[in-house]
Amino acid sequence: MRIIELTEEARTNILENLLKRSPNSYGEFEGRVNEIIENVRANRDAAIFDYTKRFDGADINAENILVTEDEIKEAYEKVDEKLLTVIRKALVNIRKYHEKQRQYSWFDSEESGIILGQKVTALEKVGVYVPGGKAVYPSSVLMNIVPAKVAGVKTIVMTTPPGKDGKVNPATLVAAKEAGVDAIYKVGGAQAIAALAFGTESVPKVDKIVGPGNIYVALAKKAVFGFVSIDSIAGPSEIMVLADETANPRFVAADLLSQAEHDEMASAILVTTSRDLAEQVSKEVEGFVAQLSRKEIIQKSLDNYGYILVAESMDEAIATVNEIASEHLELVTKNPFETMTKIRNAGAIFVGEYSSEPLGDYFAGPNHVLPTNGTAKFFSPLSVDDFIKKSSIISYSREALEPIYKDIVQFAECEQLTAHANSIRVRFEADSYPHLTLPTKA
């Protein structure tokens, strides 16, 4: 990995390079994505069956698009018992963590006759997108379905691209069943997002779409936002490690590579105050890469978006971490919890040398669907909050409104909204409205 002395110019150049990976930069694909969406919107099932044949090589129709109970049973027979046990253990941790995020309706009343509150309601229908492609991610199935279940979503459907044989990966099906999905449809890509957003004869329209995907999926989610809600427009995966001289270089190198193997556009960055550590990590990375199964992908990722940055001070290092706002941030310093108090921008923060990033990907419990491309400055991880909506509750009695109604009228008249003012006045000023009979006090 390249080692760079951290300067303002270096930081600016790296940020510019990283931001090129954002889905917002893929304008050349938008026309094709919009064409797919409009075709699905107009031709519904016929369009998604055609695209599935064209892109996935699978013959899908109205009779077989929905995964059956027999197919799920077959998937259980194919999945290793040890993997099933691990999925169930992870599910317990993920559910336990997200249970703590539950929100409840509340009401506050006063003797004067004022009742104010907030009504929390779960979304009715949610669509979860699960990618196929270069790798299979049953962990993403759990991370997207569990918070929706905890929130109380009534119907959760999942879409995922089939193989050429028309089948869905067994681990994906088992994870979905264990998490509590209601239906699984064999359709992927931008066409799946369009089907969930607008509905077809086979695929129901939903209120929100969540889940990761490729460039086409990301741009499709961006295009249908407003017709439905979405979680986020995720970019390629990212890891940043903030370390001092106390860090174990082998641990750091291994953790950087854990994200670099996702795809060629993933980023892996070490920020350190120790030149010695920087050089040791670079050597360890070189040794590890040669041994790993996805070494070609890893090497391309490191060549394009891998950096080791050497800072003059920890303050300078932390400033860089906050500016880049990585999806995953590991803190491997002498006092990592003290360091954590200075971190403002990161999707997930892994504290201490044994809190490796894959722990969060699979098992610990916090959600691994995280903001990318610097959006951790203003976005949060996927949570129960993403699957609820809130309504304000306002109730005033006559006795509560009468003492302050003229204040409201004054506000309305200031904004020249006379109908607003009349809406309040009509309840108390009989002389202004002689044709009305005002309600009497109870």
PLM regions: where:
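Conserved NAD(P)+-binding/catalytic subdomain of aldehyde/semialdehyde dehydrogenases
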Residues: 181-258, 262-267
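Conserved small/polar residues in nucleotide/adenosyl-binding loops
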Residues: 433-440
